[in-house]
């Protein structure tokens, strides 16, 4: 994704990952274009399957497109030994780098952007690790030459950074001047908490992991009362625990800001999925009557701008 962005393409990504307890198939959906994107496609034009299971489950999601399968022979797929090649270079974990090189070959892109990105990504690793990943990407490019294609030209220029929606929210909060962030980790809001924790020194933010959501909302009430712009992040179950604290903020007329990153289902719900089922709860949370403003951003730009406004 970083290499494609640095080449000047617009990139839209979505991911699906299973819980550690249940297990299952993880996948990452990447859509690229020379124009701005706002949603994934229903069918894939290129599938890179690192396991046989991925091929069997996701192979039917391709629109008569190309399938690259790790080592296994299968009808309708090109067999490319990602893992074996990575092992020969140094470590099986570099199969992803082999696959990345193969993808760029299929797309007909210059590999310089991938090589630059790998150096940037592994800048804090030993030089040997950097060179092995570069070699792995180069090997993947050679393995996929037989099915190379050509993408339409990218717009002029390059993107310096690639942000997820959760990152855009965190960046909006940081640049708006938030000084105190506290939360109990609860996916999918944890991604924003992690971004703010990693950016704390740069933006002068105090980040505190609370023991639970009740403590988090009360700490935000206290810090806001003391004059520090504050934020807490949570999901449905955690937001339910915060309701009494939200009512306290209403009584004290404190401008509390809460990120409610929604997951599907009642109670614990589905921790590794996202949804839009908590809007009524957000609007009506708290007893008595006091003003609340509920924003529902729909794009990365809105995630950034609306968070700054909040």
Regions found by a protein language model. Give the residues of each.
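Active-site cofactor/cluster-binding pocket
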Residues: 1-176, 180-182
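Thiamine diphosphate
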Residues: 1-42, 46-55, 180, 187-282, ...
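Short, structured coil segments at secondary-structure junctions
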Residues: 62-64, 75, 203, 252, ...
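Glycine/charged-rich beta-loop-alpha catalytic/anionic-binding loops adjacent to active sites
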Residues: 78-86, 151-158, 198-207, 226-230, ...
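Short beta-strands and strand-loop turn motifs
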Residues: 115-118, 260, 291
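Short acidic (Asp/Glu) and glycine-rich catalytic loops that position anionic groups and cofactors
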Residues: 172-176, 284-291
